[in-house]
Amino acid sequence: MRTFQVGVRRASFTLTSSTGGEVFSLSSSCLPFSTHFRLCSTTRSLAIVSAFIIGFTLTVIMKWEHIVWLAASTVGASPLLQFGQGGTFDYPGLRFAADKKFSITVFSDLHLGEPAWTGVGKGPDADWKTIGVMNSVLNSEHSNMVVLNGDLTSCEFVAPENVTAIIDQVTAPLVERNMPFAATFGNHDMSKTCSTRIMSEHMWHNIKGKDGKKLSFTTSSVSGPYEKIGTSNYYIPIYSSSGGGNPHLSMLLWFFDSKGGRDFQKADSDGNDVPVEGWVDDKVTSWFTLTRDAVNQQQGRVIPSLAFVHIPPHATRAYQDSKPDGTTRPGLNEELIGHQGDVCDSNNNCSYSGADTYFMKALVETEGLLGVFSGHDHGVDWCMKWAKELPNNSPANGNGLNLCFNRHSGYGGYSDWARGGRQIVVEEAKLDEIETWIRLEDGSISGHVTLNSTYGQDRYPTVAALKSTGL
């Protein structure tokens, strides 16, 4: 079983050195090959033959690798790079496609596993409708990977023996397409009956494409107690489209576990479930900043990045409270944002503790961070530019950081707004901006924006709060 230790999938921060070895010179010391090969010494003859075989084999391998890369790029999924293929940054990842773009589909708040008695339209039929949303969105987009950004399940209703079957169901559309994916976990994935570490292990070892290759990048790179650290804290490197089998590092995708929910298989003295803090732990933030700085130092430059976390940071609520113009942040704005750092009593009366301040500070200080993407709040799906000081928030100024919400993707969970997924497209030649939109279940597009230096000032059409049909 994979252990949850710091650096489980850590990069090697050393430059790859050349391998020394004897070089054979095919010179005039040996008579012309065509007529006098047999006159050469046995050692030299073997050297010539060996060099020919090695050269031919390497040529075939390189050509085959290029063919596989082009074929994978053509069908959508970016090729997976294994250890030893990432140039000076030796860490498995994905790469920009042949069209020099990297496209991510994000599904959030799928909430599989809710029983029929929880409400009208819930139960197994709702789960299959959720899978239908995923299929519809993926059929409309040409994605290189999928991010499942938390609350894959409503696991408070799921028996322990059924957890892996739920994960199989939610990843079925990805298996069908041989689609690489990564997950963060949400507060509804952490319950007394469900362990997100069991989910992660199942994804890692058992979710494979139709070609038999593993699809999941979901892992844990930070050690510590489950209720403090969570599970889904890790990163994925995205390599350049050029460079054959030795491309350079172009971008990083960061994943964070904001926890929440209930502790696994634990109860208090009264037999009640034990709540788990709903924010990214400071130890995880320290791992992030140390790893980020080490990568940048090793590469000798700032590596652009994206980040994914289920529960949004408090800055989103502070921004919402400032009542921004809907034409500068197009999207649903149908509920008050629930965010990291809230502490709630037994009657669900909550107050902000500031516990995500260290995490927000680290995000703001991360050069090249193009955007942070969250779910959790089913009635919000806009992107904000954190360029001005926000009251009652620390840090006050976000240095232009983009914070985005995903669309509620599942028919489980609350809300009746139209379901969909967020699409994120980054161009290899424009690693300072993002193009993003919501692809709705019916195939239409909502809230198409460009997150660049003028986002937050540019004006876009407002987004209609459309409802899902058949509820």
Regions found by a protein language model. Give the residues of each.
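Binuclear metal-dependent phosphoesterase catalytic core
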Residues: 80, 238, 253, 380-471
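Active-site-proximal beta-strand elements of phosphoester/diester hydrolases
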Residues: 101-114, 250-260, 264, 308, ...
